[in-house]
A protein has these predicted regions:
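Conserved catalytic cores of very large enzyme subunits
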Residues: 1-75, 108-112, 124-533
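Mature N-terminal, pre-catalytic/accessory segment of carbohydrate-active enzymes
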Residues: 68-98, 102-123, 128-129
C-alpha cells in the first residue's frame, strides 16, 4: 500500500540512516536532529512585480547560457511556475462560474476576482488588491510543494513588500487594513493554519539608518489587532529612530487582555551581529525572522535553523552519574574512569573539563546525524521555492547538499539548559568549598531525586542562581554560552559551513527537561529546563 511504499523510498531510507547514526543518543534527548522543512523567508517581491512571465523569461535566459548540468533544473523551475498558473486558472474559472450565478454586489465581487486572477500571478500587480491575491497564490503553491510540513515559512517585511502597491492608488489605511484582514485569514485555514510558526514582520531601518516604517506598517497592525489570530506570528523591528507613533500603535497589543503580543527585534543590535557573521552590509535591512526568532536574509538565506537540538542538562546529568541515566538506568554515556576520574569527588572537582569534553563529543555525533538528515531532505527538491531563493540565477535547488544554491547557508542548533548548567557549576563549587566530604552524598541525592535527602535539596536551592544579579553565576553562564557556542560553531554542515548556536527553547525546554534527572542546581528529575536559557 501507499504507506509501505513511502516507508521504502530513497528519502525514507536516507532519513532512517540519519537516525541510526544518532543511535541511543536521541532516546532520552541528549540531542535531537531533524530534516528541516520550511524555516525560510522567500523573496516574493520580484514575482509580485513582474509575474511568472517575467521570472520565466529570466530562467530561459540563464538556462540558455548555463552548462548541461543545470539545464534540467531550470526546466523544473519553469514547470513549477506552470503549476502556479494552473492554480490561478482554476480559481478564475470558479470565480467566473460564481459570477454567472450571482447578482448585485456578489456579482461585482466575483467579477473583480475573475479579472484579477486572469491577470496575476502571470503579470505584475498594479494595486494592493492584486498584490495580495498574487501573494496568496504564490504562498499556497509554496506550502503545497512542501506538504505536509511547511513549518515556519515566513513573509519577511510585509510592510515593505506591500507598501508600493498601496501607494500606487493612495489607498487609505482603513481600506488597506480591511484587505490585510483577508490576508491574515488565508494563513488560518479552517480551524488551523498552513503550518505553525509562520512569521510576518514590520518596521525597522535601512542600511543607512533611515526608518522604514510606512503607512502599510500601521494598516497591518490594525488588521492584526482586529483579527487577533494565532498565525502568522507578528514581529516588529525597532531601532533608535523608530517613530513614537509606532510605539503608540503597539501599546494596544500589550495592554489589552487576551490580545496577541508581538515579538520585538532590535535592528541596532542585530545589524552588527549579522555583519560579524558574514552578512554583506547591503543585505542587512532585508533580514527578517523565520519561525520563532531566527534572523535570516529574505530570499538569500537557507539557515536550516532547526537541524539540531542540544540538551546541556542531560549531558551534565550523564557526566555526574558515570554515563547512566538517572531516569531509566540505561547506559548512555562515559563511565567515571572513561572521563579520567577515580571517584565522585574527582568527578565534581573536574566537572567543567568533563562536561565540555562530553559536549564536544556529543556535538560531533549530533552534527553527523543532522547532516545526514539534511541529505535526506535534499532529495526532495523544491524548484518553486528556489525561484524566490536565488535559484533563478544559480540554477541550483535551495536544498542541494552538494552545491550551494543560496547566497547564505548554515545549519542551526537550538541549545537547552544553559542556566541549569551554570547554576549547577556554582552549586558544585560551593559544596566543594564548604563541605567536600559530601561529594558522594550529592551524587546519591541526585540519583534518588532528593527523596531521601531533602536537606541536600534545600542546600542546593539556596546556592546562587543565574538571573538574580549575582555576578559570579552570571559570568559562569556567559562562559558556558561562549564555550558551547564555540564547540557548536567548530562543527561543519553538509556544505562545510558552520553550525550556528541558538540559545532558545520554543517549548522544548518542557520535553527535554522531562528526560533530565535531578541536577545540582536543585532542579528535580523531569522538571522543565530554563525557558530560553
Amino acid at each position: 500500500d501507499l504507506k509501505e511504499y513511502n516507508n521504502h523510498t530513497k528519502f525514507a531510507d536516507t532519513l532512517r540512516h540519519a537516525y541510526d547514526l544518532a543511535g541511543d543518543d536521541t532516546s532520552e534527548a541528549i540531542y535531537f536532529i531533524e530534516q528541516v522543512t520550511g524555516h525560510l523567508i522567500p523573496d516574493v517581491r520580484p514575482m509580485l512585480a513582474g509575474g511568472t512571465e517575467s521570472i520565466r523569461a529570466q530562467i530561459e535566459k540563464n538556462q540558455a547560457a548555463c552548462g548541461d548540468d543545470r539545464k534540467d533544473y531550470f526546466e523544473a523551475m519553469k514547470i513549477s511556475l506552470d503549476a502556479l498558473e494552473v492554480l490561478a486558472d482554476r480559481y478564475a474559472a470558479l470565480a467566473e462560474e460564481k459570477e454567472a450565478a450571482a447578482s448585485g454586489e456578489a456579482k461585482e465581487r466575483y467579477h473583480l476576482m475573475k479579472d484579477t486572477l486572469k491577470k496575476v500571478p502571470r503579470h505584475g500587480a498594479d494595486d494592493l488588491f492584486e498584490a495580495i491575491q498574487s501573494f496568496i497564490l504564490i504562498w499556497q503553491t509554496m506550502c503545497l510543494e512542501q506538504t505536509p510540513n511547511p513549518f515556519a515559512f515566513s513573509v519577511g517585511n510585509a510592510d515593505r513588500i506591500f507598501e508600493p502597491y498601496r501607494a500606487k492608488t493612495n489607498m487609505s489605511r482603513e481600506v488597506a487594513a480591511s484587505l490585510f484582514k483577508h490576508l491574515l485569514v488565508f494563513f488560518n485555514v479552517a480551524d488551523r493554519s498552513w503550518a505553525i510558526s509562520q512569521n510576518l514582520i514590520i518596521g525597522g531601518k535601512s542600511n543607512e539608518g533611515e526608518d522604514l516604517t510606512n503607512p502599510t506598517s500601521y494598516a497591518l497592525l490594525d488588521a492584526y489587532y482586529d483579527m487577533n489570530l494565532p498565525q502568522p506570528i507578528l514581529s516588529v523591528k525597532l531601532h533608535k529612530n523608530t517613530p513614537k507613533e509606532l510605539y503608540e500603535s503597539l501599546g494596544r497589543f500589550f495592554f489589552t487582555p487576551g490580545c496577541l503580543t508581538p515579538s520585538l527585534f532590535n535592528d541596532d543590535s542585530l545589524f552588527p551581529i549579522l555583519e560579524a557573521h558574514g552578512v554583506d552590509h547591503e543585505d542587512l535591512q532585508d533580514y527578517s525572522v523565520a519561525g520563532c526568532q531566527e534572523p535570516l536574509i529574505m530570499g538569500k538565506d537557507n539557515g536550516n535553523t532547526t537541524n539540531s537540538w542540544l540538551n546541556l542538562g542531560k549531558i551534565l546529568e550523564l557526566c555526574i552519574s558515570g554515563g547512566v541515566s538517572t531516569i531509566t538506568g540505561k547506559k548512555l554515556g562515559k563511565t567515571d574512569e572513561e572521563n579520567g576520574c577515580k571517584n565522585k569527588l574527582e568527578v565534581l572537582q573536574n566537572i567543567r573539563r568533563i562536561f565540555y569534553q562530553n559536549v564536544d563529543e556529543y556535538a560531533d555525533r549530533m552534527t553527523k546525524a543532522a547532516n545526514a538528515a539534511s541529505e535526506a531532505i535534499g532529495l526532495l527538491q523544491v524548484p518553486f521555492l528556489s525561484t524566490m531563493m536565488g535559484g533563478v540565477e544559480s540554477g541550483i535547488d535551495t536544498r542541494d547538499t552538494k552545491r550551494q544554491g543560496t547566497k547564505y547557508n548554515g545549519s542551526g542548533c537550538l541549545i537547552h539548559g544553559l542556566s541549569v548548567v551554570a547554576d549547577s557549576f556554582i552549586a558544585i563549587d560551593t559544596l566543594l568549598k564548604e563541605r567536600p566530604q559530601d561529594a558522594d552524598r550529592l551524587v546519591e541525592a541526585l540519583r534518588t531525586n532528593f527523596e531521601n535527602d531533602p536537606q541536600m535539596h534545600e542546600y542546593l536551592m539556596n546556592c546562587k542562581k543565574f538571573g538574580n544579579n549575582e555576578a559570579e553565576v552570571d559570568r559562569e553562564a556567559q562562559e558556558v554560552a561562549n564555550k558551547v557556542a564555540d564547540i557548536v560553531a567548530s562543527k561543519k554542515n553538509y556544505l562545510g559551513n558552520p553550525f550556528w548556536s541558538d540559545f532558545s527553547t520554543p517549548s522544548t525546554h518542557l520535553l527535554y527537561g522531562y528526560w533530565v534527572g535531578a541536577t545540582p542546581d536543585g532542579r528535580k528529575s523531569r522538571d522543565m529546563l530554563g525557558y530560553g536559557v
